Amino acid sequence: MSNCYSKDTCVFLKKEDLSLLDQNLYKEELSRNQLIELIKELKTNPFGRRHMISFWNWSNMNKKALVECAFETIWNIRKKNNEYYLDMCLIQRSGDMLTASGAGGINESQYAALLMMIAKVTHYKPGIFTHFVANEQIYDRHIDAAKEMLQRVDKSQNQNIKICITTEIDDFFQLTIDDFEIKNYKPQTPQLKLDLGI
């Protein structure tokens, strides 16, 4: 797992090393690790109302080729039948339905995995994943692929697909892709190739 998702999320530097960062970035924000603070707060103040991570950083937006599409998560603990669940809401400003933000796209997959990872290390059950996309689109160049996908839908082929974390590792930063297992997934062929839009 990479040590940093983006400079806007967290920086693994000591305060005295912040001078190594790009001078144009807002250093006070970056000196706090939102991910570590989220995990700590979920453990020590589970029903707090400030469990959030935000990638939105006005100070360096004009320096990026693409500003974050999926830019904020909100986390809540919910008690049901004497068990505690970690729910997450992902907020996305814009999304390419077929490649990123639609059902099973990379945004949903990666954030579902993140929910599972944080639930594991905070000792809650993974709860409800809510995904809000303000501007969902299908690009013209993907129309034929979208039609093909609609023809391929076969609910009997992929029933009860599950993604599981298979390790007992309890440290978020030690988890890797090898600690995940996908069960009951049967990919359809041929694989559709879709260009990403930037």
Task: Name each model feature, range by range.
Residues M1-I198:
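Terminal, non-catalytic protein-protein interaction segments that mediate quaternary/complex assembly
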